[in-house]
Amino acid sequence: MGVNFNICLLLLLVATISSQPLKATEKDDSTDENPFGIYRRGSQCAVYGGRCIPTSVRCPPNTFQCDLSGCSWSERCCCHL
């Protein structure tokens, strides 16, 4: 009798868990897509069409390093030509 009761409890537990919606698949659009949640859309670099690039990476083609504020200490602003 004890084994049957344990099996019934196990089936009830599995049915309860499997009926729950998966919240991991929902996308939260309220979070910023920048790393570490840094918000740069209103920065001087972004206003002039620049992008914050890590200092270890060269600026992309057709861009140059410009001295505009708004990037973190480990990044620099790359502006379009």
UniProtKB/Swiss-Prot annotation:
A single Gene Ontology CC term: extracellular region
Residue stretch(es) of the prosequence: 20-39
N-terminal signal peptide: 1-19
UniProt keyword terms in alphabetical order: Cleavage on pair of basic residues, Disulfide bond, Nematocyst, Neurotoxin, Secreted, Signal, Toxin
Cellular localisation: Secreted; Nematocyst
Statement: the UniProt record of this protein carries the keyword Secreted: yes
PTM per Swiss-Prot/TrEMBL: The basic myotoxic domain of rattlesnake crotamine toxins (with 6 Cys residues) has been detected in this protein. However, this protein contains 2 additional Cys at the C-terminal region. Hence, this protein may contain 4 disulfide bonds instead of the 3 suggested by the myotoxin domain.
Transcription regulation in keyword set: no
MF (Gene Ontology): toxin activity
Function: Induces neurotoxic symptoms on zebrafish. Has also been claimed to be implied in calcification, but tests on homolog proteins suggest that proteins of this family have a neurotoxic function and not a calcification function.
Family: Belongs to the Cnidaria small cysteine-rich protein (SCRiP) family. alpha subfamily.
Name of this protein: Small cysteine-rich protein 1 2
Species whose genome carries this gene: Montipora capitata (Rice coral)
